[in-house]
Amino acid sequence: MPTTNLPLRTLAWIACALAFFLIMYGSFVRLSNAGLSCPDWPTCYGRITWPVKPAAVAKADKAFPNRPVETHKTWREQTHRFAAGTLGLLVLAEALVATFASRRRFGLVIAAIVLIGIGIPMYMAKNYVTASVLAAIGEALLLAAAFLWRGSGWRRIAVLALAVVCFQALLGMWTVTWLLKPIVVTGHLLGGMATFALLAWVAWRISIREQFNPRVAHLFAAAVIGVVLLACQIFLGGWTSSNYAALACGIGGSAFPTCLGQWWPAMDFHQGFILWRGIGVDFQGGILDAAARTAIQMVHRFGAAAVFVYELWLAHQAGRAGLRGHAIALALLLLLQVALGISNVVLGLPLAIAVAHTGGAALLMFALVTLLARTRGIEGHSGMQTASAMPAAAAR
């Protein structure tokens, strides 16, 4: 049954909303070229906040001569980190509530967080190997707590969300220290979407009050496929953005529906999709030639067409199953996302539209996760256990 614990439901939805905000804000930081505005991690030029006063700026410039302070950008990156840290605390609270009835799993979560927490100052002290080992052990403990959990309630998903959030912190660190490596930046975007999807699932599972409806149950598998296809398309979108290939086909009428005025321009798929290019290269601005970037842009378009057709079919099936409002919302989101994507190309990637395009992908993910939740109905064992049941659960 859905939990009657209002504070828990409120916590779940606040965490979900903050995850969506972080996706949007992270896109803003990346697209405004502020991703490397704080060259160290988790501090910013060695400070908890960022240098503002002239003396502090001069000291920071001396310490990082290759990355002079740009105060109009540093605040964006560091406030993004603060928001991410806040989300981490909210997800930790969810995971602790989820595991409170089981001493073993609760202990695993606490041990994992302690190890990861110790790893951060170790990393700052340049003990990179020790920090990496501690983080890896912590992640393994969280994954064990999630995947070795018998049953499929919201509780294990809450723990899995915590594991993803902790790995997201590592990706955020590597984004800076590995100089915007495309596979890391793209992985960071996917991790953010995964976090949002998991938190949305948790929020729905502890809130939904619809009984199981056999009319919509058959949509579950189709919705799962829809989520997978959308995740693949989000990867292509992140790969396009992180390789600075959004405008590879030009700007204006010659950029869409054709590319550089051609239906099949010169493309280098091999170079465009080399996922790992080593460490030490500064990827800001992109390093690929025009043919490789064009290949990335065109594959993103092909993927968009395939996802659009499938998700529109899924919306039609949802409408036939009685979920008319949900079907209309999904179809409208698809049309909006396509319009935003075309506008990005034709108008030359305006910041507001580019950020909205990322937000549109997140809203599509939310719509699909909501559909998944509605196909399952009320979860019989998802609510908060009573105090009298906790001792028995703790023995498991």
Region locations from a protein language model:
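N-terminal signal-anchor transmembrane alpha helix
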Residues: T10-S37, V228-T240
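Hydrophobic cores of alpha-helical transmembrane segments in multi-pass inner/ER membrane proteins
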Residues: L87-A93, V133-A145, G192-I206, A306-L312, ...
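Transmembrane alpha-helices
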Residues: V97-G153
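Membrane-interface helix-loop-helix junctions at boundaries between adjacent transmembrane segments
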Residues: G151-I157, L171-A194, L198-L199, R205, ...
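A juxtamembrane structural motif centered on a specific transmembrane helix
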Residues: W204-H218, A222, A367-R396
